Amino acid sequence: MSFDSLGLSPDILRAVAEQGYREPTPIQQQAIPAVLEGRDLMASAQTGTGKTAGFTLPLLQHLITRQPHAKGRRPVRALILTPTRELAAQIGENVRDYSKYLNIRSLVVFGGVSINPQMMKLRGGVDVLVATPGRLLDLEHQNAVKLDQVEILVLDEADRMLDMGFIHDIRRVLTKLPAKRQNLLFSATFSDDIKALAEKLLHNPLEIEVARRNTASDQVTQHVHFVDKKRKRELLSHMIGKGNWQQVLVFTRTKHGANHLAEQLNKDGIRSAAIHGNKSQGARTRALADFKSGDIRVLVATDIAARGLDIEELPHVVNYELPNVPEDYVHRIGRTGRAAATGEALSLVCVDEHKLLRDIEKLLKKEIPRIAIPGYEPDPSIKAEPIQNGRQQRGGGGRGQGGGRGQQQPRRGEGGAKSASAKPAEKPSRRLGDAKPAGEQQRRRRPRKPAAAQ
């Protein structure tokens, strides 16, 4: 199947071709025709499958096919909600790329930056608005944007929005929208909470599930190495050096842990940088660009800071510390093995993390293969201890960070960001992926009135 057969306009096809894409991915093959038919959609696809284009392309086709109901200033006709600033920036870049030859205006709004420039741009009229919920509600509260003409609503990474406690924000946004609209819900998994949200939001939706529920891509080779906690960094440096790994994304649980590990790896002679919410937008953007260009070999990240990162053909992901939430393991290793590429995911597991590993394997319904490098075997006399600061509080992309007015207070700055300038060379005939990488900016949270439960 080619993009030509999906009912997209020549101008959209031209833009897609200029990105070097020829063959739609499975999620695109199923989602694009359904959206063009006007169906509500409940789609589950892991990151890297091209899901962003799965809703962006038919959304643009819808807008150029139908004239807006309102006269005068362009109303917001398509609203895309995302949990983080970073993901919003990436989707916004996709929209701009694919609407290059269309008379379509788009805008990305999120917290962590001044609201005034966003208000000024909204005054000129916008067809497609990509937003984090908190900043969107700020703008609506200040009468900077009206949502009563929205024809298509997209909730992207809905599972993450629920995880981050943004359900009340979503409900408040829904009250601002017209009752008659098309709804598209995209999620990495079909959890029970997601299904409950879908029952209230969607009307007779088409369900698409490209990957099995809560499973890792078969293109990712997974391994576990048991090692004492105090020797993890030594083992990681050994494996990077011996294997001559040139591009490694490493996950830690905390921002402090990310900083400390990056410092230690640099002392080992391995060029590294940390990326998390306390880093300025400039620092995040530089680190990501340096990682993509090969100036640094290791990028150490927290879960939410790395959410939505798309680094082409990333060969190695390392869980320096296992996540407390098993589903986050799937999201982490989904950074590699994207589209048609293969990748390797390695987990360094100390005695404190054995239960976390069992939970992950229970979710995956299989045992992850073990490997052992001589000299790094764990000391059997060491007893397990409680994990300190184990469950990271979550943040996101609203006003200054999380976008959330919900019941959960995110940690400062674990949101997403603006788009990075660096972009790798495109290959001529690959499949259409999700998005391009982005950076992040942090600012102080402003006091705000509490939101009423919906």
Curated annotation (Swiss-Prot):
Biological process annotations from GO: response to heat; ribosome assembly
Family membership: Belongs to the DEAD box helicase family. RhlE subfamily.
PANTHER family per record: ATP-DEPENDENT RNA HELICASE RHLE, ATP-DEPENDENT RNA HELICASE RHLE-RELATED
Other facts: In vitro, can replace RhlB in degradosome and facilitate the degradation of RNA by PNPase.
Gene3D superfamilies: P-loop containing nucleotide triphosphate hydrolases
Region (Disordered): 373-454
Summary of the function given for this chain in its UniProt record: DEAD-box RNA helicase involved in ribosome assembly. Has RNA-dependent ATPase activity and unwinds double-stranded RNA. May play a role in the interconversion of ribosomal RNA-folding intermediates that are further processed by DeaD or SrmB during ribosome maturation.
Protein name: ATP-dependent RNA helicase RhlE
Keyword terms of this UniProt record: ATP-binding, Cytoplasm, Helicase, Hydrolase, Nucleotide-binding, Ribosome biogenesis, RNA-binding
NCBIfam families in the cross-refs: PRK10590.1
Domain Helicase ATP-binding: 32-208
SMART domains associated with the record: DEXDc (SM00487), HELICc (SM00490)
Positions contributing to ATP binding: A45, Q46, T47, G48, T49, G50, K51, T52
Xref: CDD domains: DEADc, SF2_C_DEAD
Catalytic activity: ATP + H2O = ADP + phosphate + H(+)
SUPFAM superfamilies: P-loop containing nucleoside triphosphate hydrolases
Compartments where located: Cytoplasm
Biased composition (Basic and acidic residues): 424-434
Swiss-Prot/TrEMBL induction comment: Transiently induced by cold shock in a PNPase-dependent fashion. Induced by the transcriptional regulator CecR.
Enzyme Commission (EC) number: 3.6.4.13
Record text on subunit structure and interactions: Interacts with PcnB. Interacts in vitro with RNase E.
Organism: Escherichia coli (strain K12)
Compositionally biased tracts (Basic residues): 443-454
